[in-house]
Amino acid sequence: MSLGKVVQIIGAVVDIEFPQNNVPAVYDALRVTDGDLTGLTLEVQQQLGGGVVRTIAMGTTDGLRRGASVMNTGESIQVPVGKATLGRIMNVLGEPIDEAGPIGEEDRMSIHRAAPTYEEQSSSVELLETGIKVIDLVCPFAKGGKVGLFGGAGVGKTVNMMELIRNIAIEHSGYSVFAGVGERTREGNDFYHEMNDSNVLDKVSLVYGQMNEPPGNRLRVALTGLTMAEKFRDEGRDVLFFVDNIYRYTLAGTEVSALLGRMPSAVGYQPTLAEEMGVLQERIASTKTGSITSIQAVYVPADDLTDPSPATTFAHLDATVVLSRDIASLGIYPAVDPLDSSSRQLDPQVIGQEHYDTARGVQTVLQRYKELKDIIAILGMDELSDEDKQLVSRARKIQRFLSQPFFVAEVFTGASGKYVSLKDTISGFKGILNGEFDDMPEQAFYMVGSIEEAQEKAKSM
């Protein structure tokens, strides 16, 4: 329990001098013990020599003065874990921020842990049904897998994420952990009330480090959430871990890296980008005891998927759901691009031949339609062969049938949400591909659940 004193403050980075025979280790948590900011937690990042350590503040440093005394706790940041965290909102340090009293946890764990060893890990090919047609058809999720929702600003990552949580949390009765990393406070608030209204709040732990927080909070809050998820997994449960947004985690790392004086790499990102991403992603793993299924929203800067941040994230995922601005501009929601999205599970040996053939058939028709669009724009539909005209008609029906009303968007759209089973999804698209619905107007397929609903809608048109 050595004491040190603050010698330099540069924004969120604070240098502290300790006796040379008692210097804190990297990742040790330090606590300010006097002045206006008593209780502020700092995390050691570097040892500079001469007894001085460089730390990142887990809160605002406004009002911190040089000479303030700081105590070494002798351990890394410890957060509450276990059932006591369910239904609660916590910050990066595991402190409650929902004004509902103390957490009352029985156990605490360090946010810095090693990933499961090679022997402990296990893989699964069991599918996780989401009830969202386009995802179940084209990029199915695996239980215990990692999924990324990629998209630029305002194409619906958070709404898709909330719908997935609602569907999976209600249909799958396990526990979930939600880490809000550098997102809007309003969305965090909406999310809390959405979970409360759906009666699934008692199965979700919420950890928030919002946009207005210092970079230290946003960098560590994903690890706090992950630690809680790991505890549920180690108890033998199948847990869902949601992160919104992984890009803000990278961005916080960039801010911290610049403050620590590291030389930036490509596009101004931190030189340790791949390592920081790896440290987080490798811990999100399923073991022989239990599984973590992770769904992560990934903001794509300027809609450029080759940007180093989304590109680094791609390498760790089993399924990628790419949201497209072009599809959103057509009014088709969820705006998932069925040609850009992919999944490792899309294999006939995993999902079965019928599902595989239907998914590939849908992609083939949409790809051909994409190629014909230029010809249609220049020469018009009349110049196409009869075969191509039929293909375009089916493609437009498929495109509209890939849309569906969401439960979490009911307040905005006025349409009641739909959960579509995988069996209904496959039979619907198979029917369109086989020409069973060629006589129906394409508008009948827009914003419906199953194909039976489209048939009902067509009767009234």
From Swiss-Prot:
PROSITE patterns: ATPASE_ALPHA_BETA. ATP binds at G151, G152, A153, G154, V155, G156, K157, T158. It comes from the Bacteria. GO terms for molecular function: ATP binding; ATP hydrolysis activity; proton-transporting ATP synthase activity, rotational mechanism. It holds the Pfam family ATP-synt_ab_N. It catalyses: ATP + H2O + 4 H(+)(in) = ADP + phosphate + 5 H(+)(out). SMART domains: AAA. The keyword Cell inner membrane applies. It is found in: Cell inner membrane. Keywords: ATP synthesis, ATP-binding, Cell inner membrane, Cell membrane, CF(1), Hydrogen ion transport, Ion transport, Membrane, Nucleotide-binding, Translocase, Transport. It is a peripheral membrane protein. Signal peptide: none annotated. Its EC number is 7.1.2.2. Disulfide bonds: none annotated. Belongs to the ATPase alpha/beta chains family. F-type ATPases have 2 components, CF(1) - the catalytic core - and CF(0) - the membrane proton channel. CF(1) has five subunits: alpha(3), beta(3), gamma(1), delta(1), epsilon(1). CF(0) has three main subunits: a(1), b(2) and c(9-12). The alpha and beta chains form an alternating ring which encloses part of the gamma chain. CF(1) is attached to CF(0) by a central stalk formed by the gamma and epsilon chains, while a peripheral stalk is formed by the delta and b chains. This is ATP synthase subunit beta. The gene is atpD.
